[in-house]
Amino acid sequence: MSDHYDNNNWFSGSGLSCDFSLLFSSVLLCSRKEEEEEEQLRQFRRKMVTRTTVDLRSDTVTKPTESMRAAMANAEVDDDVLTYDPTAFRLEAEMAKITGKEAALFVPSGTMGNLISVLVHCDVRGSEIILGDNSHIHIYENGGISTIGGVHPRTVKNNPDGTMDIDLIEAAIRDPRGELVYPTTRLICLENSQANCGGRCLSVEYTDRVGEIAKKHGLKLHIDGARIFNASVALGVPVHRLVEAADSVSVCLSKGLGAPVGSVIVGSKSFINKARRLRKTLGGGMRQVGILCAAALVALQENVAKLEADHKKAKMFAEGLNQIKGLKVDVNTVETNIVYFDIVEGSKIKAETLRKNLEEHGVLLMPESSSRIRIVLHHQISTSDVQYTLSCIQQALTGVQVENGI
């Protein structure tokens, strides 16, 4: 063993040599570096905890209010699978009333709500639905209608205002009595407000017209109303009137309304009976769900009235962005709480760089591409938060322009 090891050389007998002191120094250096990095991370975390974060990534980031937490703590509950949870029952009855539908069902998420709705209407595998090419169901719901339901999506181009041309919708309908090679159209889906188009609102007249087309061809109409309350406030039209033409609607409770979890789907009693069974199939049947529904009831009571202020702050934000050199936003398209803004061509900053810069100042937002960013207002963003964010963006853009001599 002594031939192979000494104080300074390992494996010397095998022709491999390593200076022990050098190795030990390297280990110490790596250890110190790791400690420094960990300390930097701890300092960053302390900053993020002590600093008030302005989170503009989505309206899904809101925290439960004190009144929500109190309602959750005191919620009357029961097993919602074995029988009915009384608080869930209250929420479902309230949502049915607000939307003018016969019945309602609480589900864990908007994605599940849309999936259940599509599957109820398209109960034959190989059915086809018509929906916007920029719709949430088509882009952001993991292709569930196809992978789980065997439903084929046929997209129609979304216009910038969130609509699809009526003529194109009707032309996309495929009659089962026609060509044998085509799937059978059974459903049309709309989204109101239309998130990817900047929170644009579909008018009553437009929705009614699509409803007429659906009835004419024996189809059903589903509305993804994740932000239907935002559309209602922006248009000055009651929710029940906005969705009158629809056979089913999904309404998100955790977006603009600010509840922590859940969505509600509404429709006829027979629709909801089928939806309840599908909810169980998909793993969405929960037990003492009233704890969550209690917060949603508070959201309906307290936060609907705050949506108009969210829309005003979004407009203020858009107008402020337009005053910053290097940015562009069409203020006239800002109808609800969503704002998309573009970094103009030729600017020396990318969206991801701007995101990182703002994060260092406690502002969180979501790039959509290398030159486009989305921000979403909600009731936990104040006017001063908007002004602070605009100031941070101005400083970031000014710094880049100075560095590049612009």
Language model regions located:
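Conserved PLP-enzyme active-site core in the AAT-like
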Residues: 2-6, 10-32, 41-361, 366-381, ...
